[in-house]
Amino acid sequence: MRMRETQGAQGRGRNAPPFLRTILAYIALTKPRVIELLLVTTIPAMLLADRGDVNPLLILNTLLGGVMAAASANTLNCVADADIDKVMKRTARRPLAMSSVTTRNALIFGVVLGVGAFAWLWWTANLLSGLLAVATIAFYVFVYTLVLKRRTAQNVVWGGAAGCMPVMIGWSAVTNTIQWPALVMFAVIFFWTPPHTWALAMRYKEDYRAAGVPMLPVIATEEKVTKLILVYTWLTVLSTLALALAAGVIYAVVAFLAGVWFLAMAHQLYSGVRKGQPIRPLRLFLQSNNYLAVVFCALAVDSVVGWPTLFQL
């Protein structure tokens, strides 16, 4: 959910009045398309935490706090990455790369969003969810962006942990604790992130090379990259099946069928590279979004329907 995340808002505002262009630039800083992952995973996590019997107001408040936290992390990421965003074609139209927003104002905006996220979640949910939001922002900015991203090809493996946190925040907002289903959901997204991101990086590896970012497709052969994509895809699917122990039959069936489909795409990509055939990594990137959405939507439906879990059958 990363491609073209900032170009849409700014593109629509090119002929807008200056005030509106400024608003759109600040919206673009938050990378709205990246925030979609929050919506796709947080609601199902909250529904599973209480088997569908969750106060709708709590869901809305948690989503608002989560959106502010994600927007804060993404904005501060833009501040830290402004130099390489100017080099990469895919990110050259981001607000700081185009000087649509000053670095100082972007930094203030990101910090205010982060403080607001913590305060809102503490006030409307509980302290644990607020602290998890702060930890997510800090990890994404200081560990992933400032340390891992420019130093190791495993950047998205460990840095991807930040994208797993919305399920933890959602679960803790309902239960005020962290239990094993939340950890399994964390694992699903953790293992899903590398194949999702590496598929995109295969398409834009020259961009990353020019910016000096050692993404795996930049420093490794296509065969090695697609092999690791396949390994992490298997780990993703196995994690979704493990989650079936806490969910019901609807989720189990959908997770299995979606997993077969996702694995087929990953195997096809790996096989294509080994046979020297033309490959379409961007297709896997796009379809991985659909896969995650299908699995978590099935989890939400299962939780609301309230059919017996596999433990109860």
UniProtKB/Swiss-Prot annotation:
Record-level Gene Ontology MF annotations: protoheme IX farnesyltransferase activity
Job description of the protein: Converts heme B (protoheme IX) to heme O by substitution of the vinyl group on carbon 2 of heme B porphyrin ring with a hydroxyethyl farnesyl side group.
Native organism: Mycobacteroides abscessus (strain ATCC 19977 / DSM 44196 / CCUG 20993 / CIP 104536 / JCM 13569 / NCTC 13031 / TMC 1543 / L948)
Lineage of source species: Bacteria, Bacillati, Actinomycetota, Actinomycetes, Mycobacteriales
Record EC number: 2.5.1.141
Family: Belongs to the UbiA prenyltransferase family. Protoheme IX farnesyltransferase subfamily.
Other known facts: Carbon 2 of the heme B porphyrin ring is defined according to the Fischer nomenclature.
Reaction catalysis annotation: heme b + (2E,6E)-farnesyl diphosphate + H2O = Fe(II)-heme o + diphosphate
Name of the molecule in the record: Protoheme IX farnesyltransferase
Any one Gene Ontology BP term: heme O biosynthetic process
